[in-house]
Amino acid sequence: QSVLDQTKEVLAEIDRILAEAGSDKTKILKANLWLTDMATSGQMNEAWDGWVAQGHTPARATVESKLAASGYDVEIMVEAAV
């Protein structure tokens, strides 16, 4: 699965978790993103830019790292107000 598709799936899961907590992506304060290969950052950015709420872009850091779960190329952690 491409990084673009993986990122879209992760962002959909973030939407779901935030909704369960009574929040949404406009209340994200900070996001940390990990990629197994920074050469795929364009795909990740395409998904991110299409998802993030205009006027509510949180602080964000993206780094290259080996991920704990094999088979995944992107991991995203967000902190949001509820």
Question: Model regions: which residues?
Answer:
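Short, polar/acidic, helix-capping and beta-turn segments at strand->helix junctions
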Residues: 1-82
